[in-house]
A protein has these predicted regions:
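Acidic catalytic patch
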Residues: 58-79
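Short, well-structured N-terminal submotif of metal-dependent ribonuclease cores
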Residues: 1-33, 42-58
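Short active-site oxyanion
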Residues: 28-30, 58-61, 94-99
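Acidic, PIN/NYN-like endoribonuclease modules and their adjacent C-terminal/linker elements
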Residues: 18, 90-121
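Alpha-helix capping/helix-boundary segments
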Residues: 10-11, 37, 69, 88-89, ...
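A general structural signal for well-ordered alpha-helical segments in protein cores
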Residues: 34, 38, 50-53, 70, ...
Length: 121
């Protein structure tokens, strides 16, 4: 597998300075996210701090949605009964041959292939 993708909750923890998230990100040379994750993070930020958060996320390699990711997300949505935005996030990792790092075990079961749950809070 190639360098992983990070889910929204891991990045929120990282932005909040949680040591577990800082340690997890430090394990990897490249940090990749879906445009959906970027959007979810900005949506949770007050307007006054969004510019700063965009700068903090700038080093992350951003993956835009395309037809392959959309088709894979539709399959995941139907097969696994997953929320559509979560299906897009997982599909972005899978289409790019990577795992998804998350601590969201409610939407991404730990036993699901391609999921890494590094810690819980």
């Amino acid at each position: 597998l190639s360098d992983p993708f990070f889910d929204t909750n891991i990045l929120i923890d990282w932005l909040s300075g949680k040591p577990q998230a800082i340690a997890e990100l430090s394990r990897y040379r490249r940090h990749r996210i879906s445009r959906i994750v970027w959007t979810e993070i900005l949506a949770g930020e007050p307007m006054e701090t969004r510019r700063n958060v965009v700068q903090l996320l700038a080093p992350f390699e951003m993956f835009e949605l395309d037809e392959r990711i959309a088709a894979a997300a539709a399959d995941i949505y139907s097969r696994d009964n997953m929320k559509l935005l979560d299906a897009y996030i997982l599909a972005t990792a899978q289409v790019n041959g990577a795992i998804l790092i998350t601590r969201n075990t409610k939407d991404f079961p730990a036993e699901m292939p391609g999921i890494r749950i590094p810690y819980s809070l």
